Design a protein with these regions (language model features):
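Active-site region of PLP-dependent enzymes
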Residues: 21-127
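Conserved PLP phosphate-binding loop immediately N-terminal to the Schiff-base lysine helix
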Residues: 1-35
Length: 127
């Protein structure tokens, strides 16, 4: 199946939108994965974000990005029950993103060709 800008992973609500850039482009009731890798429209060198309108998913993803910890509870007071990945964006990278955002909004995004980017659905880890 060909795709343009984004695609859903299998029968899930997870969207690979790594090359997608569009005002008000969020698709409701999804986990929309964005990339800020150096080739992307909002180029921060690395990192990304997952957009969601599901509060429960947001809370779980936030914990996962902080090594499975709740960022609002002191480390010593927690009994971790969630797998964590240490994937939070540093304040410096977030600040750079805010600096670059006005220009990114005004700039026409690159149109990616399907052959330029791997389709995650073809990778064993997602099968």
């Amino acid at each position: 199946e060909d795709w343009s800008d984004f695609y859903f992973l299998g029968g899930t609500t997870i969207i690979d939108a790594a090359v997608f850039w569009k005002r008000n482009g969020y698709i409701r009731r999804s986990l929309m994965c964005l990339s800020f890798q150096f080739q992307k429209h909002l180029s921060l060198g690395r990192g990304g974000m997952i957009l969601t309108d599901d509060k429960e998913a947001r809370d779980e993803l936030k914990k996962m990005s902080y090594d499975g910890r709740d960022p609002d509870i002191p480390w010593r007071d927690q009994n971790i029950s969630t797998i964590g990945y240490h994937y939070y964006m540093t304040p410096e990278t977030a600040s750079l993103g805010l600096e670059k955002l006005p220009k990114a909004i005004k700039t026409e995004p690159r149109v990616w060709d399907i052959e330029e980017w791997p389709d995650l659905r073809d990778m064993d880890v997602f099968k």
